Swiss-Prot record:
Protein name, as recorded: Ribosomal RNA large subunit methyltransferase H
Enzyme class: transferase
NCBIfam families for the chain: PRK00103.1-3, tRNA_RlmH_YbeA
Any one annotated GO CC term: cytoplasm
Binding positions for S-adenosyl-L-methionine per the UniProt entry: 75, 108, 127-132
Residues annotated as transmembrane: none
CDD domains assigned: RlmH-like
Gene designation: rlmH
Cell location: Cytoplasm
Amino acid sequence: MKIKLVVVGKLKEKYLKDGIAEYVKRMGTMLPLEIIELADEKIPDNASEKEAEALKKREGEKILSRIQAGDQLAILAIQGKLMSSEEVADFVKKAEVYGTGNLVFVIGGSLGLSKEVYQRSDLQISFGRMTLPHQLMRLVLVEQIYRAQMINRGSAYHK
């Protein structure tokens, strides 16, 4: 099994790239993490609701094209389930033991995720009701994936 992180948009800030690279390097000997960046759709100024939905749908199609039939899909959603690090670790462990494909986490674009992505998801995770930059959320999620692996291996990293 592999863990994949599918994200909409490019990571620009070097400090975030460096932080993510450090956790990816640490995970190299455990469950490897593959990050897949998808181009975001350009949002016109004053886009109508219909235009915004069409853009989300196109981004959703790109996301779903990266998901295989046996993959478990966890999406980040403000209205998703609040989970402790231990609960995330349990989810990762169950995917590793019982899953038939890869474990895929998704961070959508600035408009959110399409209803098709929501419908395909196996789990919707919330990190709280605060709005955070998607690029920063990427680092937070990668750290939590690393932490989950450390918890599952009984490491002292998680205290």
